[in-house]
């Protein structure tokens, strides 16, 4: 983060990433494939404030979901993040005004991409939460909802709250040091192994590698 005109700016070198190397490699390749389209998607701001480039809705359907997925393993997510995704899904379907053959192909392509990136099971869990909490109709879902995984995800959300700030199952996080936080997060992710084994097992390894990389490459 760094300030620009007194506004905090968070810069990412990639939109998102996965902890499992194979899925992460596929995701980074996909980002490169669609990058030009995202950078050329210009929208006009209201009241004459100019133009900006924004990601397309088909991109956000995948990107925001992957962002939610990553936060499940790095502290937790709250209903406010799920509400954001509800509107992304609704916008995606609004763009597909009629379920024509072309639109069916778009849905099939999206579902194939979610499977390839390792997001299929989590997407089904999210659809269940969006249905139970926000009333998302089944015909508006991007994948069939997964009730079992969805109930587990909703329980995690309700126990932990936004970014897991209310999750005290592994003790009080107030004033914890880096070492304590490392082991707490690693232990926390073990409860996800049965549901999302590749990401849950790779997250501590990724975190260790990234910490080492920063120590060796980032200058102060």
Task: Please report, for each region that a protein language model flagged, where it lies by residue.
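Conserved NTP-donor binding/palm subdomain of two-metal-ion nucleotidyltransferases/polymerases, i.e.
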Residues: 1-220
């Amino acid at each position: 983060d760094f300030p620009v005109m007194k506004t905090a700016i968070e810069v990412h070198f990639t939109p998102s990433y996965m902890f499992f190397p194979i899925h992460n490699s596929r995701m980074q390749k996909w980002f490169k494939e669609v990058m030009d389209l995202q950078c050329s998607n210009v929208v006009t701001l209201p009241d004459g404030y100019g133009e900006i480039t924004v990601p397309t809705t088909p991109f956000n359907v995948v990107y925001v979901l992957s962002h939610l997925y990553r936060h499940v393993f790095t502290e937790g997510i709250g209903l406010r993040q799920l509400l954001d995704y509800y509107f992304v899904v609704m916008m995606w379907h609004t763009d597909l005004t009629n379920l024509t053959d072309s639109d069916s192909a778009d849905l099939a392509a999206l579902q194939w991409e979610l499977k390839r990136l390792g997001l299929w099971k989590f997407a089904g869990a999210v659809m269940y939460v969006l249905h139970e909490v926000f009333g998302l109709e089944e015909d508006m879902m991007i994948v069939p909802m997964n009730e079992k995984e969805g109930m587990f995800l909703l329980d995690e959300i309700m126990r932990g709250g936004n970014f897991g700030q209310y999750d005290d199952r592994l003790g009080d996080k107030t004033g914890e040091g880096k070492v304590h936080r490392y082991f707490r997060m690693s232990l926390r992710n073990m409860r996800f192994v049965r549901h999302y084994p590749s990401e849950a097992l790779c997250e501590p390894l990724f975190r260790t590698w990234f910490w080492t990389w920063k120590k060796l490459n980032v200058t102060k």
